[in-house]
Amino acid sequence: MSPLETNPLSPETAMREPAETSTTEEQASTPHAADEKKILSDLSAPSSTTATPADKEHRPKSSSSNNAVSVNEVDALIAHLPEDERQVLKTQLEEIKVNISFFGLWRYATKMDILIMVISTICAIAAGAALPLFTAPSTFQRIMLYQISYDEFYDELTKNVLYFVYLGIGEFVTVYVSTVGFIYTGEHATQKIREYYLESILRQNIGYFDKLGAGEVTTRITADTNLIQDGISEKVGLTLTALATFVTAFIIAYVKYWKLALICSSTIVALVLTMGGGSQFIIKYSKKSLDSYGAGGTVAEEVISSIRNATAFGTQDKLAKQYEVHLDEAEKWGTKNQIVMGFMIGAMFGLMYSNYGLGFWMGSRFLVDGAVDVGDILTVLMAILIGSFSLGNVSPNAQAFTNAVAAAAKIFGTIDRQSPLDPYSNEGKTLDHFEGHIELRNVKHIYPSRPEVTVMEDVSLSMPAGKTTALVGPSGSGKSTVVGLVERFYMPVRGTVLLDGHDIKDLNLRWLRQQISLVSQEPVLFGTTIYKNIRHGLIGTKYENESEDKVRELIENAAKMANAHDFITALPEGYETNVGQRGFLLSGGQKQRIAIARAVVSDPKILLLDEATSALDTKSEGVVQAALERAAEGRTTIVIAHRLSTIKTAHNIVVLVNGKIAEQGTHDELVDRGGAYRKLVEAQRINEQKEADALEDADAEDLTNADIAKIKTASSASSDLDGKPTTIDRTGTHKSVSSAILSKRPPETTPKYSLWTLLKFVASFNRPEIPYMLIGLVFSVLAGGGQPTQAVLYAKAISTLSLPESQYSKLRHDADFWSLMFFVVGIIQFITQSTNGAAFAVCSERLIRRARSTAFRTILRQDIAFFDKEENSTGALTSFLSTETKHLSGVSGVTLGTILMTSTTLGAAIIIALAIGWKLALVCISVVPVLLACGFYRFYMLAQFQSRSKLAYEGSANFACEATSSIRTVASLTRERDVWEIYHAQLDAQGRTSLISVLRSSLLYASSQALVFFCVALGFWYGGTLLGHHEYDIFRFFVCFSEILFGAQSAGTVFSFAPDMGKAKNAAAEFRRLFDRKPQIDNWSEEGEKLETVEGEIEFRNVHFRYPTRPEQPVLRGLDLTVKPGQYVALVGPSGCGKSTTIALLERFYDAIAGSILVDGKDISKLNINSYRSFLSLVSQEPTLYQGTIKENILLGIVEDDVPEEFLIKACKDANIYDFIMSLPEGFNTVVGSKGGMLSGGQKQRVAIARALLRDPKILLLDEATSALDSESEKVVQAALDAAARGRTTIAVAHRLSTIQKADVIYVFDQGKIVESGTHSELVQKKGRYYELVNLQSLGKGH
């Protein structure tokens, strides 16, 4: 049964009142874990969105990118509303807080899973218990003392050897079963969590998404579920095995001889105390280090998210210095942390060697007193050695468990949330027959994500069945809100929405949405074929289960109706063409027509068209418009339109202004009334006669997709679910200028680097630390000698204890000496381990700091096109700075030191063994490669498991993210079940393939564990034979045996660094790639002519431009424009027509594709970039302030640090903010908070203007500098801008025309060209495009 048919709310959660919601992380169990969680969540949080060129032109209605707001904040924001309205908003936002125990992670385990886990647990414990049973060497002593004959000895020996072989076989079986079992149940449980999570996400109301941000869902479904899987898979088995080893070893020791075991346990207490004390410091220091990195990360995030600002002002160096302050701080704490770690490891080795000394010394006393025999002493010592080693294997896994619990708390919180608008619910009635009459009664609406804005106030509106109602009005007047309320995406805070007189609240939500088809302004297609995309329109309708032929007929008819059939059949694969993720392989007009076909295919009763033709050019719009009019016949249709010509035939036209109805009637009635609507019509009518189709426009459809595929570099290659890349090759009839040039550009390639290149590259970061490196490496060699020395001492001690009773006085003397030697080795180990730890600590922390600071500076060096790419989003780059640099230290000194240490151990062990007894040494050496291979395979497999499961889930995660990021489309198509079933099928397929690889790789892992026993058996058998023939004494036997086996095992641990080294290699390649990338427009470049002065004459000559990330969309099409020195020039036009692009090209954020831009007659691409930009100042729509004081923020306007006070004051006075600053208690030293959050919009904007004026620019660029302000602040800021423009060449982009009436020249843009120019009064008299814009705006003001 799929989770869809069950309710994930268990009775006890359903009974509970939804808890007050907050997003604190109480679940993270230790302060350290909590801290890491915080950093992780900070990294994964979707970064604050800055306007990329793409969304500058289309800003979504609600872009609150902050993650789930806590309840107290929500309460504060809605406090001004009446109680019932508050309740409506709260239910749409409410979150549940869940507390989870570790066992709660198996919430969805089936009976089968539990059975497998029980078996795996038993096996894991058995596998752990086998290791200490290793300890049975008493036979040797009896033969040394000639107590038994050779034959008797040989029988005993064979028994012992067989005992090891059986243990090995047992180990193989138990390890195999427990590894496979835990990995399988871990994957299975996580798969269920993923399915329930997606199901729950698809259930949630749209308001919840507005607040959540798609990034959050992506993080949960990818990173967080991986953390859970990590915490409940093989690590559970490894931990149980280690604990079992520890317990068994100590039981054996105490059973054999409790007094000696008790004395040896005392050092374990010392060890625990040392570790505990040390870890307190480690937690403290790493918290401080993480805090500093966090603060640095915030700076990096602020700077990268406002990169245009930093680039325009040339303040990269200043900002990089601010970042480096935090890095230095982090380095200081990080170094302390690593040094403490080094001392802890040193203390651990020191105590362990002292423990051997103590054990032998006490053992010799007990032996002489006759209290115990030699065999028991050896057993106790071996057992304690093995037991204390295994305890070290538990701690690394503990972190994985706490992370898993913390990650699950958030995910289960969403799963348990009951959506107020649940599309899965069967509640509510369905109507057998309805006409389609829609009515809004006294509706008041507020978006949950923006509770401070009332979008609609007391609107009553009747939309008769079978008739077309059109909504017009300025943006933000509430047109799209009507659509959102009819679709029930939101609940109105007051009033009702009725369908045929039934309150839609009482109707079943899924049924309601199935009766309605929606075509929105920016149509969303899914990453599948055109056929399947149109077929999505049939989900839940009476045609859903028709025969395939009938469905195909319906789909083709719908495509013909939407004027899409012809272009679809012209594609090589026709209807089976894959459209790519979100349909990016098609042009805007093609996507729009497929969306229309999808909407009409099910013959819906109600059709909602939200600016359905806005993405089309004039030619295709006419055809589609005719199609829509045909489609609207006989249905209730609601049309939102900007172009009034498209709604002339509507039965009723409703003019909305500021959330209220201004006037309504038919086209003729409204024109006769002579109100606002008539002015609009006149303005538009005049224009439509004047408009001539632009060259690029007429053939926008024919811009070949082959060209697009060429420009789109590998970065956006979309692939189908089975992994085949999808592109459309189609030859076009005619290319525009810019696409012709773009198609000649070579595609970007990704360089590959050899391991040696990367090692040299990483080493270059550590060049100044070479003395520390040398100290570290020398002490690593010394530390590596500890193990071989210990083996000699061990063998000496054993042969001493084997002396017969007659030599007890010699025994006591020798035992004292060798015990003392153990103690000395312990002290030496403490010194060498601590010293190399400290030396490498300095190296690796400095490496991380240098890498971060260099990377940050290199990122700031890049051109703006680099930041427009999706893979270089603010979040991605900040996380690259924090995680990849950490990985880089995987090939720094510490790892090299460890490798050197273990190589020394192995080398010394082999030499000593060969010197003392070459026969046995050679036999033992023959198994070393096998042991090493086992060690290597073990870690290779673990690394494979992890990377495999990450990769496997990327495909399905992408699918889930595509669905959640276009949740409105999924909801309006009622595709929730369909999406869930595809996701479920993908996870199932992954589960099957991963099971096969788990079965294979666990086989290797289990073999590697069992081989250790077989190798021991071989050495034991051959050594025993030599002993029996009295060729070797017990000393030679034990030296060779323990040197090589222990040496090889410790050498095997080198491979535990393999995953780190793998990550480090990838990280180094990423860094190298970044450092090798030379931006086209290079901020560091000294080339080009440096300017002494600038007059300020500007000219654009036939400039063509497309954004590198959207090469299919021409933005400027042959722009010609001149500005005289000192002129105030305004650029106006509808959104997306290229105004802001003109400013970006002037700042040289991008280079034009064709044509040239001249300042004072010089081509700006030939000038020195920094010299040129120093004469410009930019004030943009969203003022950018950084953490710090007002003064620091203003000083960012210039490169120099020391500015005379009077310049600063003059800039502030000109910006109309000086008085305000002086009124603050701290004056210029007032802290502005993150992103300037402590100041209002108007205050921030004026600080930004002061910063721009401090440069004393010759050219001032204003990009909608007042559009984000309310009318009060707008006046003040506008006055400041007018003052600032005196005596300078000023170019202003404006949405509010009232702000530019005084301009010397106004250029009117449309579709990337200038259609009119002149002064305000000239243009108004022309009654052209400008006149229409003026009327549109006065409509908004007049009511």
Swiss-Prot record:
SMART domains: AAA. The chain crosses the membrane at residues 114-134, 163-183, 235-255, 263-283, 339-359, 366-386, 773-793, 820-840, 887-907, 920-942, 1010-1030, 1037-1057. ATP binds at residues 473-480, 1133-1140. GO terms for molecular function: ABC-type transporter activity; ATP binding; ATP hydrolysis activity; ATPase-coupled transmembrane transporter activity. It is a multi-pass membrane protein. Fenamirol efflux transporter activity is inhibited by the cyclosporin derivative PSC 833, nigericin, reserpine and valinomycin. The effect of reserpine is transiant, while that of the cyclosporin derivative PSC 833, nigericin and valinomycin is proportional to the time of exposure. Cyclohexinmide has inhibitory effect only when applied prior to addition of the fungicide. Its main location: membrane. Residues 115-403, 774-1063 form the ABC transmembrane type-1 domain. Residues 438-683, 1098-1336 form the ABC transporter domain. Induction: Expression is strongly increased in the presence of cycloheximide, camptothecin, imazalil, itraconazole, hygromycin and 4-nitroquinoline oxide (4-NQO). Glycans are attached at N99, N309, N545, N872, N1083. Pleiotropic ABC efflux transporter involved in the protection of the cells against a wide range of toxic compounds. Confers resistance to the azole fenarimol via efflux transport. May also be involved in the secretion of penicillin. PANTHER family: ATP-DEPENDENT PERMEASE MDL1, MITOCHONDRIAL, ATP-DEPENDENT TRANSLOCASE ABCB1-LIKE. This is ABC multidrug transporter atrD. It comes from Emericella nidulans (strain FGSC A4 / ATCC 38163 / CBS 112.46 / NRRL 194 / M139). The gene is atrD.
